[in-house]
Curated annotation (Swiss-Prot):
GO biological process: glycogen biosynthetic process
Designated name of the protein: 1,4-alpha-glucan branching enzyme GlgB
PANTHER family, per the entry: 1,4-ALPHA-GLUCAN-BRANCHING ENZYME
Upper lineage: Archaea, Methanobacteriati, Thermoplasmatota, Thermoplasmata, Thermoplasmatales
Family membership noted in the UniProt record: Belongs to the glycosyl hydrolase 13 family. GlgB subfamily.
Active site: D393, E446
Oligomer and partners: Monomer.
InterPro entries reported for this sequence: A-amylase/branching_C, Branching_enzy, GlgB, GlgB_N, GlgB_N_E_set_prok, Glyco_hydro_13_cat_dom, Glyco_hydro_13_N, Glyco_hydro_b
Length: 705
């Protein structure tokens, strides 16, 4: 026990909600006697219960006190509130909150990358007493207290301990159980009390309510046998709330699971990328303005429901990637912004700390506590939710200090440059940690600049980078009237110049089908049939081109309208789109199972100079890929090939299987007529606005895959 002496000043800090060391006043103490104190501002009377006997506690300005000549080790407190309600509690201050000095040290040095195991709300049993251990970082706060229904949301009734004056506050509260709603009441140096959500909350109330919820982490996983794909990666990007709706309302994570699995099997994708599930207040932010980085949104259910979704996907050999937003956070008053009355999580200077385009706050990547927080938020989803990868959003905005800013609106780094050295080092550290600890988990950068080494081990060490240059150039080409596409062939050939500079994913993402940009279908010129043909041609080109694949939901069946986050996909478009979906299934199977296509190094041009016919062709290994970008059939079109073999057509987007005109090339024998630098050639009938993919028959009589 601690020896202390009672002074009115000690109690004043409690009544003023400014107590940073309540353990020095409350709980059991040895002074001139054995004294037990409890601060219960909502009580009109309090009693101590010892060996089933009740003793009156003295009210000293809502600090209730009991004195004894004998040491008391086991007791409870009964209080009566102003309404006459009686409640019996264990005294939080006879327990030491659980946080190690080493964790405090690591968090303060920016190297506690699994801080979620310590911070937040954790159900525990201490000295045979069950309760919840709360830990939060708020270094500039005068006091922090836990509030909830258990104390009538009264600030100061459960003041936390500023452990070692580290700015990390902790308190074990007995009796707290699963599903208890809580917040932190933070007294700032401006004499304000802010009611804040727990930055490490693992579950929250459904919007518009903002309370954090205590959960028990006891989900039973059955995905031990799941193996992540190491070769082909075909990603279906989706937004859970607008994929399908249940009579206008959201489906639960569990309800989504089997519907999604069935759809992915029909289309052949082996990976799903889910737009941010981390809790966010605003539906129309799509999830990219996150407040609770450790909580799956309660829009679609509870944390165990989301774990169920991931587990079911793994049971069906489908990988799961989550979008992760480490760059910035919103202004919502209950969240990270001005958390302890200061710019704790963001840069204070708006030239560093404010995004000019999005009106959000940029994380202070140089503050060690923030580094621990962001890194832990990334690792958390891999550790606790078994996800197979993270797609880091807005990496360019993290790297560049002048991102979206005019001259004079940004602060150079210590070398006078425009690189945020703190952000760059943090990204590198997070990637290194993940790759060292988790086998075959992938990280992906959405990065649009020419910053070098995004996917190199000596650079930022991401596994993949979105090839946004390829995406924009290719979509611009397809948007062009076929009559003029011959003047834009460079749009297709330019990306080959840098295709191996990074490990790329070819994305056709949500960003390209919103804000008036139109759906993939609407981007295409021509009448309805020509638009569908162009979509099939585009998808075939994408799946033939080196790089992993990513396609946003709706594009797999050529949805006509652009994406609307407030409604479900236009599933009625499947009447026409089912043929596109059949093609996607076949393209995915080809890509996943044929080494020629999933080995990104297998690429060589056959011909990119036929601007007259607007036809290009290339090899993927020994496969021959030919693309006719005009609505004109090219009969007896000659292509150079490497083998004196019979060539088998494995994809033809004009096939009746895909509702095309059925101009086919079932088998073509190569002749000894050199062409395009090859010793042999074949002549094919090339359908209008179509892709044809052929492979040579091998010695065993099958196509060479």
């Amino acid at each position: 026990m601690i020896k202390l002496y009672n002074t009115c000043m000690d109690f004043k800090c409690l009544n003023d909600v400014e107590c940073s060391h309540p353990e020095k006043i409350l709980g059991p103490h040895l002074e001139d006697a054995y004294i037990i104190r409890a601060y219960i501002p909502i009580a009109r009377a309090a009693f101590i219960l010892i060996d089933n006997k009740k003793y009156q506690m003295i009210d000293n300005g809502k600090v209730f006190e009991y004195r004894s000549d004998n040491e008391i080790n086991d007791y409870k407190i009964l209080y009566i509130d102003d309404s006459g309600y009686e409640k019996t509690i264990d005294d939080p201050y006879r327990f030491r909150p659980e946080i190690s000095d080493y964790d405090i040290y690591l968090y303060g040095t920016g190297r506690l990358f699994e801080a979620y195991k310590t911070f937040g709300a954790h159900l525990k049993t201490i000295k045979d007493v069950s309760g919840c251990n709360f830990v939060v970082w708020a270094p500039s706060a005068l006091s922090v207290s836990v509030v909830g229904n258990f104390n009538h949301w009264t600030p100061g009734m459960h003041p936390m301990i500023n452990v070692n004056d580290s700015g990390i506050w902790a308190l074990f509260i007995p009796g707290i159980k699963e599903n208890e709603v809580y917040k932190f009441a933070i007294k700032t140096k401006n004499n304000e009390i802010k009611m804040k959500t727990d930055p490490f909350a693992f579950y929250t109330e459904k919007r518009p309510r903002t309370g954090s919820i205590v959960i028990n982490d006891d989900f039973h996983w059955t995905d031990n046998s799941f193996k992540r794909s190491e070769n082909a990666l075909s990603i279906y990007e989706m937004h859970l709330g607008s994929w399908k709706r249940n009579n206008g309302d959201y489906y639960n994570y569990r309800e989504i699971a089997d519907m999604l699995i069935d759809h992915l099997k029909k289309t052949g994708f082996n990976c799903v990328e889910i737009m941010p599930v981390m809790e966010h207040p605003l539906d129309i932010s799509w999830g990219y303005q996150v407040v609770n980085y450790f909580a799956p949104t309660s829009r679609y259910g509870k944390p165990d429901d989301f774990k169920y979704l991931v587990n079911r996907l793994h049971e069906n050999n489908i990988m799961v990637i989550l979008d992760f937003v480490p760059a910035h956070f919103p202004d919502d008053d209950y969240g990270l912004y001005m958390f302890d009355g200061t710019h704790l999580y963001d840069y204070e200077d708006p030239r560093m700390g404010r995004t000019p385009d999005w009106g959000t706050n940029i994380f202070d990547f140089g503050r060690n506590g923030v580094r621990s927080f962001i890194a832990s938020a990334a690792v958390f989803w891999i550790d606790k939710y078994h996800v197979d990868g993270l797609r880091f959003d807005a990496v360019t905005s993290m790297i560049y200090l002048d991102f979206g800013r005019k001259p004079g609106e940004w602060i150079p780094n210590i070398n006078g440059g425009n690189i945020n050295l703190e952000a760059v080092s943090l990204l590198k550290e997070i990637n290194d940690y993940i790759h060292n600890k988790y086998y075959n988990v992938i990280t992906v950068a959405e990065e649009s600049s020419t910053y070098p080494g995004i996917t190199s081990e000596s650079g930022l060490n991401f596994n993949y980078k979105w090839n946004l240059g390829w995406m924009h150039d290719t979509l611009d080409f397809f948007h062009e009237d076929p009559l003029y596409r011959k003047y834009r062939i460079n749009n297709l050939t330019f990306s080959v110049m840098y295709m191996y500079s990074e490990n790329f994913i070819l994305p056709v993402s949500h960003d390209e089908v919103v804000y008036g940009k139109g759906s993939l279908y609407r981007k295409m010129p021509g009448n309805k049939n020509e638009k569908i043909s162009n979509v099939k041609l585009f998808l075939s080109y994408m799946f033939s081109y080196p790089g992993k694949k990513l396609l946003f939901m709706g594009n797999e069946f050529a949805q006509k309208n652009e994406w609307n986050v407030l409604s479900q996909l236009s599933w009625n478009d499947l009447d026409d789109g089912k043929y596109v979906m059949e093609l996607i299934h076949d393209l995915n199977n080809l890509y996943k199972n044929d080494f020629n296509f999933y080995n990104d190094k297998n690429f060589s041009w056959i011909d990119f100079n036929d601007k007259t016919n607007t036809v290009i062709s290339f090899n993927r290994g020994n496969a021959v890929c030919i693309f006719n970008f005009t609505p004109v059939e090219r009969e007896n079109y000659a292509i150079g090939v490497d083998y004196p073999s019979r060539y088998i057509e494995i994809i033809n987007t004009d096939s009746k299987k895909y509702n095309g005109g059925n101009i086919l090339n079932e088998s073509i024998y190569a002749c000894k007529y050199p062409m395009h630098g090859r010793r042999y050639s074949i002549e094919i009938d090339l359908p209008p606005l179509a892709a044809v993919i052929m492979e040579p028959e091998d010695l065993n009589g099958s196509s060479g895959n």
